[in-house]
Every structure is written in C-alpha cells, then in structure tokens.
Amino acid sequence: GYTIRIYSNSNSTERTTWLVNAAKDAGFTVSIDDNSVISGDTAAIQAANENKDGDILFGLNETRWSQVVNGTYENLSLVDWTPTWAEQVGQYAYPGAAYGLVIQNVLMLYRTDELGTNGEALHFQHWSDIVNCGYKWYRQNKVGGTTNANINSALLYSFVDPTSPAGGISIDGWKTLWNYCANGVYSSDDTYKYGFDPLNKGDVAVSTFYSSSLYGKIDAAAESSENPLKGTMTPENWNLVEIDDGTYYIAEYIGILNKEGRTDEETEAVKAFAEWFGSAETQAAWGEEFDSYPCNTAAADILYPDGVPAIYTLKNFALSKVDGDTTYAEYVAAHSAEWTNILTNLGFYWADSSA
C-alpha cells in the first residue's frame, strides 16, 4: 500500500507511536518524524515546504494555517476536500481546505483560600485588569513559547489599535504588559516555566496556565506542594478568574497537501486517512490518551458525557473581529514579528538573564 507522509508539530514520541499504530490498525501505513527530528510549528512547516513529499499536514495553529491557506509557502498548497464530519467542528474550519482537530486556551486562575483572595471572587473585564487586581500575580519567564505568546496575546487584546505604529497595539497596551512583567512574581527556576506550580505552592494568588494539562495537574497537586490546590472538577480552594472578554484559544487543524506525482488512487487513500483521523471516534481516543480537547463536538460528547468542562465553555476572542473582517487570531499573526521585536528590544524580560 501507499505510505502516507505526515508533517506535524504535535509529534512527541508518544503521539507519533500512537498514531503509527492506530493508523496501522485502521489499514493505513504512515510515516511521521517525532520531535527529535522536527520540533515546533516553524520547523514542521519549513520541512514540509522544503521536502515537497508531504501528504498530510496537521497541528500548528490559526496563525500558520491562515498562511498555508493563503499560499504563503511556495511549495505548500491544499487539496480541496470536505470530510463527512465537517459540520461537527463548527467554526474551526477553513472550508474546503483545513478542519479543526484540537483546541486549547490559556486560563487565568486564582486561589480563594488565605493564600489567595480569602473568599473574594475575581471578575475582570479584560485580561489586562490583572495588573490592578491588588494581589500578587505570576508572570512567565521568557518571551518565547506558544503558551507565553498566547498569554501576551490575551493581555494585549483590549489594546488593539490598527492606527498604532507600535505593532497595532496602543502605547497603553505596551505599558500595561511592561507593568505585568515588571511587577509579576518571577523565578528562573524550572517550576516557574509555567504558572501552575507557583499558584499550587501559594507563592502567588493569581496565575496563568494552559488548558490541556490543568485537570491532570490538580489531580496530582499534593505531590509537589504542602498547600495544594484541591477539587479538580469542583474547585475547593481555587477558581477561574471570570473575564468578560473570554480568552485566547488556539486550534490545531488537518489539511491534505497537493503532491506532485501522487496518483488519484493514492490521493483517495490520503483523504481516507484524514477522514479517519479527524473523526469523532479517533479524536475521542486521541483526546483520552493525550489530555487534549477535540474541536469535534461528537468526540467531546464521547469524552465528556457529563457535559463540557468549564474551561472550554469560555468565550473565544481569538475569533472575534477586531479590524474590519480580521479576526484577532489573524491580527496576532499579522503583527507577531513586530510584537516579538518590541518585547525583545524593550527588554520586557530584562532581569531574566541575570536572575
């Protein structure tokens, strides 16, 4: 049979092993590099563009997919297709091109006990209100990384100004982000790479984290703290900060690449694989295995028969229109290089190298 060549950044050794075996059981032969060979979305997309041998591209985020769909990469174009489950992924689609697999978002959490707000409920209009909350907050310890970038995007959302020469964000926005970094609790310690541990230890009252690992982390919270967070699905001493704007989600998608010399019959096999991988059953199994949340609502129903977890009911402002017809995710994509320059040049994380 035909070997289906896959490029992805969702390619930990566990994921690639699972995918090769599950695909084999479903009658497909696939080839995919794990993250010892290709690490990150930039590397995955560059390899696919340079090697020109890919059949399937999956993972990435809206930033990258809008580029692929719009023909940014010389050798990457997508086959026109519509899977039978297209309706089940709703708004997570580039119709006829790419369809949603997995969503995750960033969360703002706080302690409600005496190490936190002592029972006071936190309710913000914007993410950026954290700088005026009156409590100690965590801030991440580097510019790079998907989660860190998403947190910055969430904090900058309320300061969109298409007329601003500073990356389309008002000067107040950059001042607020500076304040967030300068006055947030920081450590170069490895446990401070993300915001769960500082909150779990009680070093801060308010923190940020990514959705896909939250429930698992709370389940195991007592292993790494004397003052652990308690109550996974029914919080006892913690909660989500209620934020009117919502939060910033990223979604992973799957698309079928055009490939020179591939026969019609082989293309049909590739389509059949994409159909299988994005289906409710497969995505529910993938979500179960890797603690991820499916775009496919039928898969979510299989995974969560008791209803959608609270962290995935939050409004998604990445898909809100901010400048004419442009979504905030597209706006972030258009300005991301400028934002990285601003963050770096202004030394937002200035103390880190010497900390």
At which residue positions do the language-model features occur?
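Early extracytoplasmic/lumenal segment of secretory-pathway proteins
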Residues: 1-66
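A structural signal for short loop-to-beta-strand junctions that line the ligand-binding cleft
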Residues: 52-57, 74-112, 138-139, 244-246
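Ligand-binding "clamshell"
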Residues: 68-79, 90-96, 217-242, 308
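Periplasmic-binding protein-like
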Residues: 83, 87, 104, 175-181, ...
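Short loop->beta-strand "edge-of-pocket" segments that line small-molecule binding or catalytic clefts
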Residues: 127-147, 155-159
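Ligand-binding pocket segment of bilobal, Venus flytrap-like solute-binding proteins
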Residues: 154, 161-239
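Mature extracytoplasmic/periplasmic domains
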Residues: 252-326
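Conserved C-terminal helix/tail region of periplasmic/extracytoplasmic solute-binding proteins
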Residues: 315-355
